[in-house]
Each structure stands twice: as structure tokens, then as C-alpha cells.
Amino acid sequence: PVVAVCKELRASCEHELRFWCDRKFGASARGIFGKFDETIPVELIIAGKVRRYHGKSMVFHLHPSILLPNIRDVFLVGIGFIQSFCKLLRWRPDVILIKGGYVCLPVGYAARLLKIPLVLHDSDAHPGLTNRLLAPFAAKIGTGAPLEHYNYPDVKAEYVGIPVAEEFRPYSAAERRQLKVKFGFDPARPLVVVTGGGLGAARLNEAVIVMREQLLAETSVFLISGKHQ
């Protein structure tokens, strides 16, 4: 979605664009933007995240394997805030687009301190922690799902959907049949493609496996799974 937004901005204005991400995604981000526009620099921000497991007890969250990384990451968020503040102080952008994720938290707070406008986009049906924390400071909020799924203020929130690049288009019936044959599926049966996030989603994968007999009774299923998922 970010690439789709950058393409539209490139086509409509000549402003300088920069993409910031967590260190873990630096290589993949540079590869993606290298194919699209090498003039957009990819810069890395130090960040930490809060490990929360819904439905688990407080005792579970106090286990050293969870507690210690969370304590460490509090300091990483602080470092990321200082890093973001210094970068923004030098660059002074007109606006910052926040797409969610823990790396956006220190950036958002630094922008708030420097009074740089924030625009949030929430692709998820339920807002993540970072977007919930930054929403009070945002000038505008775009959502991927209808507004009734969110608690964002109506005065600043708008249902805009998911940004999709022009290269992604609906396939014709003939093209869909050809692809089914190419991947070994019956072209006469409906095909359900299931994928969950960049690395797959373990719970989604498990649900598909549990329901496989029911699904396969009526459709073909193509499950795309991340490594170790």
C-alpha cells in the first residue's frame, strides 16, 4: 500500500519523499523501492515492540522470555524517538504518513513534539496499538474498513479503503481459468486463495486446516503460508 501511495504522490507532485522502516525490513524495503523509484531513500529507525498475548494471564506475561525483551524494547523505543526527532529536526517534512506498526510509534511522538502533521492509515479491521496511541494527534485518519469497525473520531476519520497499485487489476474469467490450470486446479471449481500477512498467520493457517474438509467439499483451496507458520 505504501508503494501505491508513493506512486500517486510522484505523479501529482514534485515533493521529496522518504520511506522509514524498522531495521528488520530494510533490505526488503530497499529492494521494493529500488524497482519502483531509486530516488526515494529508505532510512532505518530503531524501534521496539510490546509483546502482548490476548487471553493469557499476567503471570504468563511476567515470564522472563516475554518480560525481559519488553523491558529491553522500552529502551529501544526511546532510542528510536531520539533518532526520529533528530532526523525530523533536520528534514522538517510537511506531513508524515503513518501506516501502523511499532516502528511508527517513536516517529509519531517525535512528529507530535515538532508539530509536524500526521496522517494515519489503518489497513486492519481492528486498529493496532500504535495507531490507537497516535490517533489523538493525527490530522487525518484513513481506514481500510468501514468506520464502524474503529473508535476513531468521525471528524478526522474517513473510510478510504486499501491503496492498491495500478498493476494489480481484476483478472478476466478466461485468465482465471488459465491460472487454475497452470497451478493444477480444476478450472470448473471455485478457487479460494488464503494468505495472511507478509510471513503468514499461524492462526489463520490453522483455521484453514481445521476446516479443510468443509472447504474442499465445495472449492479448491490455495494456502500461502509464511516460513515456520
PLM regions and their residue ranges:
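Short, charged/polar "capping" segments at the starts of alpha-helices
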Residues: 24-31, 148-151, 167-168, 228-229
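Glycine-rich, highly charged phosphate/nucleotide-binding loops
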Residues: 70-86, 174-178
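Short, solvent-exposed amphipathic helices
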Residues: 76, 100-103
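Donor-nucleotide binding loops and adjacent catalytic segments primarily
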Residues: 14, 19-20, 25-27, 49, ...
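Short amphipathic alpha-helix
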Residues: 1-10
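Conserved nucleotide-sugar phosphate-binding/catalytic loop shared by glycosyltransferases and other
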Residues: 11-76, 158-160
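Glycosyltransferases and closely related glycan-assembly transferases
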Residues: 32-37, 82-97, 105-119, 132, ...
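Active-site-proximal region of nucleotide-activated glycan assembly enzymes
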Residues: 39-40, 112-174, 185
